[in-house]
Amino acid sequence: MVREDAEGPAGHVRNLDDGRRARRHPGDWCHAWLSECRRALKPGGLLVSFIDWRQLPTLTDVVQAAGLILRGVAVWDKTLGRMRLRRGGFAQQAEFVVWASRGAMRGCDVYLPGVFPCRLPLPKQHVTEKPLDIAREVVRLMPAGVVVCDLFAGSGTFLAAAREAGLHWVGSETNQAYHAISSARLDATTDDSGVQPRSI
């Protein structure tokens, strides 16, 4: 499984150099790494990507252009305590979870909801941090023996959830401060084997 969060602060798409990339051509950048994800995924492997409403149409198009099969969009409802009110319009209290597979899906007896109402505890460790409870649910889709790859690890939430579940994991984070946060989080996380990780 590849888990990623292409969006950075204020709807900017993340860049491996400085965390921000102009919104003008986010599809080109996403297509490049999504094509590599497709190549790396085994048949039946899943891509799970969190995205803001501003880039949702682009991501669903580019996922398919990269050769993955779009399976749907789930919703993270950040709940009333984390919403941004919009004068004369709807509150922004949701993020979207685009999921896709490389080819036919593997058989899996896990049935997740389409909406996850979950408040992120404060203080946040990363600007686009996701709740650990949601990460734990997402990794339930992974059969034993698979590798969870988080291309933009941030504070390491999904890596910690994968580790707790006894799954193999690999993460990437170029920001030194967030790398340190991820490493500390993973050092404090154990799985059923009790083996402590070294670092990401």
What feature does the model see in each segment?
Residues S183-Q196:
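Short, conserved SAM-binding/catalytic segment
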Residues M1-A180:
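Core catalytic lobe of class I
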